[in-house]
Regions:
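Glycine-rich phosphate/pyrophosphate-binding loop and the adjoining helix
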Residues: 142-218
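N-terminal beta-loop-helix "entrance" segment that forms/cooperates
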Residues: 41-65
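Short, solvent-exposed amphipathic alpha-helices that sit
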Residues: 26-37, 133-148
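Hydrophobic/aromatic beta-strand patches that form the interior of the parallel beta-sheet core
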Residues: 14-16, 44, 71, 112-114, ...
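Helix-loop-strand module that forms the ligand-binding subsite of alpha/beta enzymes
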Residues: 58-142
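N-terminal beta1-alpha1 ligand-phosphate binding loop
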Residues: 2-44, 177, 198
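Short, conserved loop/helix-junction motifs that constitute active-site signature segments
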Residues: 8-9, 103-108, 148
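Generic recognition of short, well-ordered alpha-helical segments
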Residues: 26-30, 55, 83-87, 167
């Protein structure tokens, strides 16, 4: 037991939870509670911590740099992450820190998406009303990880969060807890190749080397 606890405490997991209304949450609220109870996990409730959207960039960078695994926990809103989670990425993952020349603070770390959808799994198919599999909506997450030299780990999803049974939610939470506890010893972790990184010219950052992600235009 002592050895297992020591292993968990050394994991260095930073979990970013983003939900605009926790009172209406059926699944993410349970996952948040489980993460808060897990040893070795630092939890940041973004909407609770930054209700005015004024993110403490230095503190967030310190937390992210100290972690081996960064978890993005949120519902999918219009095929993407909630607004405050996107703002966190824009402001915290700066050029020269997270990517670009000298930007290696996150290199080699894992990025893990833990997400819920309102629609059932059947809706995420060419025949469903979302027209695509969920995989089709993952490129922004994957490329964010790649640009920062991180490993994007297979997402943990729960479809149909509004209607799924309590038994299914409980099983999902248990699986989430086991995965948190077992990191970094996840299947195939040792087979991951290091990302080569990307040389982003300073001139491509119109706001200077301290600006956020490459998705930000003029």
């Amino acid at each position: 037991m002592a050895d297992r606890l020591k292993n968990v405490l050394q994991q260095g997991i930073y979990l970013l939870a983003a939900h605009p209304n926790w009172r209406e949450s059926r699944v993410n609220r349970e996952l948040l509670s489980a993460a808060r109870a897990a040893p070795g996990v630092t939890v940041q409730d973004l909407y609770g911590r930054y209700p005015d959207y004024d993110i403490d960039v230095a503190a967030e960078q310190a937390n992210a740099a100290a972690a081996r695994l960064i978890v993005l926990l949120h519902p999918i809103h219009w095929y993407a992450m909630p607004a405050l989670q996107k703002l966190w990425i824009d402001e915290v993952l700066t050029h020269g820190w997270a990517y670009g020349a000298g930007g290696d603070a996150l290199r080699g770390k894992d990025l893990w998406l833990v997400a819920t959808t309102g629609g059932p799994e059947s809706s995420y198919s060419p025949q469903g009303y979302n027209s695509h599999s969920f995989e089709a909506f993952l490129p922004p997450y994957r490329q964010t990880a790649a640009l920062c030299g991180m490993h994007f780990r297979p997402p943990l999803l729960l479809y149909g969060a509004h209607t799924v049974s309590q038994q299914a939610i409980a099983a999902h939470v248990r699986n989430f807890e086991k995965l948190l506890e077992s990191h970094p010893h996840w299947p195939a972790r040792e087979n991951l190749d290091a990302y080569p990184g990307y040389a982003v010219p300073d001139g491509d950052r119109p706001y200077g080397s301290g600006s956020g992600s490459g998705s930000r235009g003029s």
